[in-house]
């Protein structure tokens, strides 16, 4: 689909920063802001948002159903809801078949859909052209790796967050074609999985909801794939743990090339920024955003870090910030360090330029 409308989330100030490759902004207070080389939408998110914007512009008296959040950013999702898009909650996706007409338009989010729902949708619509599929190409690459590995009889191990839409999409496809499947959300879980396999009882002490056919795991080769927004370093650490387990727990082990280029690059840029002397780092993005959460985790290892969902969460006196581990909001006062402090800014790949610009302008005014 050729773009027919301009990006509703673009901002000329951010465009100028990119054009000038400006990563440092000096403030009149003597403080300065430091940004990584890449900010704003990654390619997959930009493509998905543009598809939906074009669909809204082209729709002719047809209802548009968005099957879950387009991306994990409330500013973006709220914008499209105000444009008339009917966005379904992730827990209510099945209701689309009783609420929608077969002639409506249906938009698949950037994360993709679980396998069964995808198949039901394609059987439900009157014409294939009524489905606007914005699934990220890197997510599709994971699906393809799963299907290819399954043809060889390999079990699939997924480094992903249980319950996340993308991981659910990978999981349901793997469960359909592979002899066994396991979700491993962390390196610690990788050790836990190995400890739960023979000679102990298969599946013991490992969450059953993260396993399919656990008894078959020791008898299969293993292929590791990953949710594209996880920490790349942790995916590689999990690969090392599983590979080192050797034939004691499984057959041959391979790691699929499913690390997202944008995720890897942005995490590397975040590490580089964190290595600078930043008195405080602000991370901006949706609190349900996996890639934004990983940026927060990286930054929090280095210095005081605040996770903001909106520029409105901050002023010169206090900051309202999210704690991912505790899944709680907290209000902190006296957050602003004195001049000549450097304030680092990290931005999730689903955070629009308009939000980034609003945060920078607020800091220019209050910091």
What would you call each of these model-derived segments?
Residues 1-367:
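The feature marks the mature, well-folded catalytic cores of soluble enzymes
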């Amino acid at each position: 689909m050729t773009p027919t409308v301009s990006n509703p989330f673009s901002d000329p100030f951010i465009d100028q920063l990119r054009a000038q490759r400006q990563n440092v902004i000096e403030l009149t207070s003597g403080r300065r802001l430091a940004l990584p080389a890449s900010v704003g939408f990654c390619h997959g998110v930009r493509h998905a948002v543009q598809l939906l914007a074009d669909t809204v512009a082209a729709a002719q008296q047809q209802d548009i159903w968005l099957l879950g959040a387009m991306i994990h950013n409330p500013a973006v999702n709220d914008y499209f809801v105000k444009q008339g898009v009917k966005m379904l909650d992730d827990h209510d996706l099945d209701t689309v078949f009783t609420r929608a007409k077969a002639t409506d338009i249906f938009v698949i989010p950037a994360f993709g859909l679980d396998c069964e729902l995808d198949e039901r949708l394609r059987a439900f619509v009157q014409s294939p052209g009524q489905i606007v599929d914005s699934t990220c190409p890197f997510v599709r690459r994971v699906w393809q790796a799963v299907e290819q590995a399954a043809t060889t009889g390999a079990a699939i191990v997924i480094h992903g967050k249980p319950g996340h839409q993308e991981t659910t999409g990978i999981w349901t496809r793997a469960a359909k074609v592979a002899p066994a499947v396991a979700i491993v959300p962390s390196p610690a879980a990788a050790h836990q999985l190995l400890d739960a396999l023979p000679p102990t009882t298969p599946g013991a002490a490992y969450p059953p909801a993260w396993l399919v056919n656990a008894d078959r795991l020791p008898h299969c080769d293993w292929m590791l794939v990953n949710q594209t927004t996880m920490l790349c370093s942790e995916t590689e650490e999990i690969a090392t743990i599983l590979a080192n387990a050797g034939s004691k727990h499984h057959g041959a082990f391979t790691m699929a090339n499913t690390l997202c280029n944008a995720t890897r690059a942005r995490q590397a840029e975040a590490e580089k920024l964190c290595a600078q002397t930043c008195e405080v780092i602000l991370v901006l993005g949706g609190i349900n955003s996996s890639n934004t959460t990983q940026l927060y985790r990286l930054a929090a290892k280095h210095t005081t870090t605040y996770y903001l969902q909106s520029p409105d969460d901050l002023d010169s006196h206090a900051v309202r910030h999210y704690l991912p581990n505790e899944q709680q909001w907290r209000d902190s006062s006296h957050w602003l360090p004195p001049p000549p402090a450097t304030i680092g800014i990290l931005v999730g790949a689903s955070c629009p330029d308009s939000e980034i610009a609003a945060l920078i302008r607020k800091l220019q005014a209050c910091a």
